[in-house]
C-alpha cells in the first residue's frame, strides 16, 4: 500500500493509519454540493481527504473534521498543517455521537462504515473505519439531524445495497432524498455505489448515473468531475 498520494493542490500522507485514498472518497469529495456553504462538517475524517477537497473547492468555508481513531486523527492533523488551507481546517479528535456545537452546518459529508460485525475481516483502524458497529446508520443520521441547518445538505457514499437501507433509515429520521447518483464502473455493469444527498428541506429531487470507465479509459463525466484534483487528468 502506498504511504502517500499527491493531488494537484494538496498531498495526503497515509502513515500507519491503514486508510488508503479511495475512489469512493474522491467521488464524494468532488460530487458534494458545497458551493455556497460557510460551515462544513466532515464525519470520520480519516486522513482528511474530504476536508481537503472541500477546502480546495470552497475558498470561504470553515471545515470541522471529526475523527475518533487516534492514529488517523494525527495523520489528518498533519495533512491539514501541510495544506494551503490550514487556517480553515480544524481536526476534532472525538466520538461523533457525543459531538456538540453552538452553530449549525450548511453541509455534512461522510463516507460511512458499511460492514456489519463479522462480514469483513480487516485489521486495526481500517477495520473500525468500515464496520457499522462503530457508527450505526440510525445513530449517525439522528445526530446529523441535530447538527445540520434547516436547508443544509448531507452527502454520503455507500454500496448500493447498504445505500438503499441507509435511505430508508434517513426518511424515518425526517430527511428528504434530494439527489442521488448511481455509480457504475463501466456502462454494461450494474451500479456499485450510490452518492446520496439528504436534506431536512425538500429540495428539487435529482437523479443521475455516473460511469467511471469507457472504452478509452476514464469516461468524460468522471474526468469532468475529478479533473481539478487528480494529476494527469487534464
UniProtKB/Swiss-Prot annotation:
Alphabetized PROSITE patterns for the sequence: N6_MTASE (PS00092)
Whether Ligase counts among this entry's keywords is no
Q: What is its EC number?
A: 2.1.1.223
Q: Which UniProt keywords apply?
A: Cytoplasm, Methyltransferase, S-adenosyl-L-methionine, Transferase, tRNA processing
Alphabetical GO biological process terms: methylation; tRNA processing
Q: What class of enzyme is it?
A: transferase
Keyword check for Magnesium, yes or no. Answer: no
Please give the catalytic activity noted in the UniProt record. Answer: adenosine(37) in tRNA1(Val) + S-adenosyl-L-methionine = N(6)-methyladenosine(37) in tRNA1(Val) + S-adenosyl-L-homocysteine + H(+)
Pfam entry (one): MTS
Q: Which GO terms describe its molecular function?
A: nucleic acid binding; tRNA (adenine-N6)-methyltransferase activity
Domain of life, per UniProt, equals: Bacteria
Question: Where does the UniProt annotation locate this protein?
Answer: Cytoplasm
> Which GO terms of the cellular component aspect does the record hold?
cytoplasm
Chief location of this protein within or outside the cell: cytoplasm
Give the protein's biological function. Answer: Specifically methylates the adenine in position 37 of tRNA(1)(Val) (anticodon cmo5UAC).
Protein family membership: Belongs to the methyltransferase superfamily. tRNA (adenine-N(6)-)-methyltransferase family.
Query: This protein is called what?
Result: tRNA1(Val) (adenine(37)-N6)-methyltransferase
Report the source organism.
Aliivibrio fischeri (strain MJ11)
Amino acid at each position: 500500500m502506498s504511504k502517500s498520494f499527491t493531488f494537484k493542490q494538496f498531498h495526503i500522507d497515509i502513515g500507519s493509519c491503514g486508510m488508503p485514498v479511495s475512489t469512493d472518497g474522491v467521488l464524494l469529495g468532488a460530487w458534494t454540493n458545497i458551493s455556497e456553504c460557510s460551515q462544513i462538517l466532515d464525519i470520520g475524517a480519516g486522513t482528511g481527504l474530504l476536508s481537503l477537497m472541500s477546502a480546495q473547492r470552497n475558498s470561504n468555508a470553515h471545515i470541522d473534521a471529526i475523527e475518533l481513531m487516534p492514529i488517523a486523527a494525527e495523520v489528518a492533523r498533519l495533512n491539514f498543517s501541510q495544506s494551503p488551507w490550514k487556517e480553515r481546517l480544524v481536526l476534532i479528535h472525538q466520538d461523533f455521537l457525543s459531538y456538540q456545537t453552538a452553530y449549525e452546518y450548511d453541509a455534512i459529508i461522510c463516507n460511512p462504515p458499511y460492514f456489519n460485525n463479522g462480514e469483513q475481516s480487516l485489521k486495526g483502524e481500517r477495520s473500525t473505519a468500515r464496520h457499522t458497529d462503530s457508527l450505526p446508520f440510525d445513530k449517525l443520521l439522528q445526530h446529523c439531524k441535530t447538527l445540520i441547518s434547516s436547508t443544509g445538505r448531507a452527502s454520503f457514499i455507500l454500496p448500493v445495497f447498504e445505500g438503499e437501507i441507509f435511505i430508508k433509515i434517513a426518511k424515518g429520521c425526517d430527511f428528504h432524498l434530494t439527489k442521488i447518483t448511481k455509480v457504475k464502473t463501466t456502462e454494461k455493469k450494474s451500479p456499485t455505489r450510490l452518492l446520496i444527498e439528504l436534506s431536512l428541506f425538500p429540495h428539487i429531487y435529482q437523479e443521475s448515473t455516473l460511469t467511471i470507465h469507457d472504452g478509452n479509459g476514464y469516461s468524460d463525466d468522471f474526468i469532468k468531475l475529478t479533473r481539478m484534483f487528480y494529476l494527469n487528468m487534464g
